[in-house]
Each structure stands twice: as structure tokens, then as C-alpha cells.
């Protein structure tokens, strides 16, 4: 069974490391970003190069 996780702020810093860790554990990753699209795309490409079709990006402004 595949598991999927949505990681907010995953394009940089701690969120990025969390995404990489879950990817190493075999999870599908949804990478959230607000304005760091290039960083999110780079991370998705990095994850997908090791585990094809397991990472996707989504943009959302989560300010409340």
C-alpha cells in the first residue's frame, strides 16, 4: 500500500529534509510551496530521479 504525505513549506530547509526522509521511506510526496516554485521543482525532480513519479508540487498561499 502506497502512503502519501503533504508537506507544507517543503521547498526549503526543514520541510525539504522531511520530504527527502519520507521519500527514502517509500512515501509519495506532495511538495507545497507558496512562492519558491523553482526550489519545489528542483526537489520534486531530485525525488523523482530516485523514485519515479512519487513527488508532485502544489502552490497555495496558506496565510490565514
Identify the role of each PLM range.
Residues 4, 9-13:
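Conserved glycine-rich cofactor-binding loop
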Amino acid at each position: 500500500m502506497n502512503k502519501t504525505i503533504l508537506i507544507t513549506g517543503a521547498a526549503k530547509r526543514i520541510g525539504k529534509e522531511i520530504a527527502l526522509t519520507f521519500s527514502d521511506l517509500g512515501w509519495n510526496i506532495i511538495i507545497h510551496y507558496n512562492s519558491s516554485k523553482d526550489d519545489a521543482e528542483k526537489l520534486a525532480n531530485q525525488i523523482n530521479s530516485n523514485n519515479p513519479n512519487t513527488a508532485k508540487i502544489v502552490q497555495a498561499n496558506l496565510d490565514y
